[in-house]
Amino acid sequence: MWDIGCNDGVFSRIASAHSDYVVAMDADPLVIDRLYNTLKAEKNEKILPLYVDLTDSGGGVGWRGQERPGIFNRGKPDIVMALAVIHHMAITFHVPLASQLDMFRDLTPELIIEMPHADDPMVRKLLTNKRDGIHDDFNLDEFERLLNERFTVKSKMLLSSGTRTIFNAVRKG
């Protein structure tokens, strides 16, 4: 299992109780460093924290790009969890929702993903310095349409905040 956008690893820990191994990824190196040190002190070997910036993950590195393969060539997870991450990639880094969902479709047969609604406080904060209309397609209806093109939704749940929905979906075909 991969936990993309793991932050402090709370959900990675929960997932590790139900999974053989969790790769916990985040684009914040300080968060990953803290998680690594905490897991090391606990002697927790079921979670591997990795610094990964999906918006600039690149290919392999080393001689001829082959010494260490890029993250997408290191294995395919049975399930990916992406909580509190897609709005950052869409709004901050301008990666369209469709492209993100294509990546997830190509990566994993099962997905747990959180979609913050347009009225979510963090979404509004991220949009503060963006010109009007640039992210009009960032909304729950469009996300569900795009998700349903690529995945079959097994379940969805509105979180208590009322501004985020979590989906569990399996890849079509």
Task: Annotate each PLM feature.
Residues 1-7:
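Conserved class I S-adenosyl-L-methionine
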Residues 8-20:
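Conserved SAM-binding loop of SAM-dependent methyltransferases across substrates and taxa
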Residues 21-26:
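Conserved SAM-binding motif I beta-strand of class I
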Residues 36-74:
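S-adenosyl-L-methionine
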Residues 81:
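A conserved beta-strand element that flanks and buttresses the S-adenosyl-L-methionine
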Residues 88-104:
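A short, conserved alpha-helix within the catalytic core of class I
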Residues 103-117:
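Conserved beta-strand signature within the Rossmann-like core of class I S-adenosyl-L-methionine
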Residues 134-150:
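Short alpha-helix
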